[in-house]
């Protein structure tokens, strides 16, 4: 079986560098392309330069040329860039791994639509530990059920542009679904001033942006007399990058939209 040919979008960013490291150290996959904006100083340089590696792949801004020799594209950029890459992947019938967060409903619909033609793994978090945490949260919510106040606290580095994180929102969805609630109507995002007593049917979110925090998430279930806290802390972006490469290998030639629960056999 030939190696899986992967293209990395946003290769000069924090996740892009981690993805290149993951691809170049994983048997059975090869780096087939590395994409950046046309104005990036990395264009024309070896994609491994920021890592002190020699990959033999030059950074390019030519999406069509990169996809012409690819099996899948891995994208952890921003919604507007992801949707442009999505359109290109549809044209070239190239599968896509999407770790970008912050999509509106229209963006999510575009991804679902593309899943009718190509294979897509779209997930808010590619960490194995986080996806196990989703299962633990489902169990906790069903067992604790009513009478517990639920709060989700997340922390990320100062450069993250969306809040709450996609992972925090997914955690909220998992808990809300387990309780038979709609997160859109029960979520409370931040509190300020005189808010009155807590509505027992709500799920609260608190966001921290500071320093170089890779990603911390805690879901708190609290009732008079006890608290249950389920926490995941990431210390390296390689955790997410390795998960994304694993997802690409699992996806193979499949068509349709999947997430990491499918990849890990947790669904």
Curated annotation (Swiss-Prot):
Show the SUPFAM superfamilies listed in the entry. Glyceraldehyde-3-phosphate dehydrogenase-like, C-terminal domain, NAD(P)-binding Rossmann-fold domains
A cellular component term from Gene Ontology for this protein is: cytosol
Recorded source organism is Laribacter hongkongensis (strain HLHK9)
The top of its lineage is: Bacteria, Pseudomonadati, Pseudomonadota, Betaproteobacteria, Neisseriales
Write down what this protein is called.
4-hydroxy-tetrahydrodipicolinate reductase
Please give the biological process terms from Gene Ontology that the record holds: diaminopimelate biosynthetic process; lysine biosynthetic process via diaminopimelate
Gene of this entry: dapB
Q: Locate the residues binding NAD(+).
A: 10-15, 36, 99-101, 123-126
> Where along the chain is (S)-2,3,4,5-tetrahydrodipicolinate bound?
157, 166-167
A GO molecular function assigned to this protein is: oxidoreductase activity, acting on CH or CH2 groups, NAD or NADP as acceptor
Gene3D superfamilies from the entry? Dihydrodipicolinate Reductase, domain 2, NAD(P)-binding Rossmann-like Domain
The entry sums up its family as follows: Belongs to the DapB family.
Which residues carry out catalysis? 156 (proton donor/acceptor), 160 (proton donor)
Enzyme Commission number(s):
1.17.1.8
Which compartments is it annotated to reside in? Cytoplasm
Identify the keywords attached in UniProt to this record, alphabetized: Amino-acid biosynthesis, Cytoplasm, Diaminopimelate biosynthesis, Lysine biosynthesis, NAD, NADP, Oxidoreductase
Q: Which residues bind NADP(+)?
A: 37
């Amino acid at each position: 079986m030939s190696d899986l040919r992967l293209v990395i979008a946003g290769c000069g960013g924090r996740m892009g560098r981690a993805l290149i490291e993951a691809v170049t150290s994983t048997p059975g996959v090869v780096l087939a392309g590395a994409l950046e904006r046309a104005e990036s100083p990395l264009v024309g340089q070896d994609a491994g330069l920021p890592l002190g590696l020699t990959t033999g792949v030059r950074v390019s801004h030519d999406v069509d040329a990169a996809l012409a020799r690819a099996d899948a594209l891995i994208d952890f950029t921003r919604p507007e860039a992801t949707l442009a890459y999505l359109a290109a992947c549809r044209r070239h019938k190239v599968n896509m791994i999407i770790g970008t967060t912050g999509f509106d409903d229209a963006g999510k619909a575009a991804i679902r639509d593309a899943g009718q033609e190509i294979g897509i793994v779209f997930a808010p978090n590619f960490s194995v530990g986080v996806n196990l945490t989703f299962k633990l949260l489902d169990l906790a919510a069903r067992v604790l059920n009513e009478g517990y106040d639920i709060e989700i606290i997340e922390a990320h580095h100062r450069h993250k542009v969306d809040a709450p994180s996609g992972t925090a929102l997914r955690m909220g969805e998992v808990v809300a679904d387990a309780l038979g609630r709609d997160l859109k109507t029960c979520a409370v995002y931040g509190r300020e001033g005189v808010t009155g007593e807590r509505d027992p049917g709500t799920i609260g979110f608190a966001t921290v942006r500071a320093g170089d925090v890779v990603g911390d998430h805690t879901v708190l279930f609290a009732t008079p007399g006890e608290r249950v806290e389920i926490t995941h802390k990431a210390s390296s972006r390689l955790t997410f990058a390795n998960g994304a490469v694993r997802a690409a290998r699992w996806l193979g030639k499949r068509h349709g939209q999947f997430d990491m629960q499918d990849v890990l056999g947790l669904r």
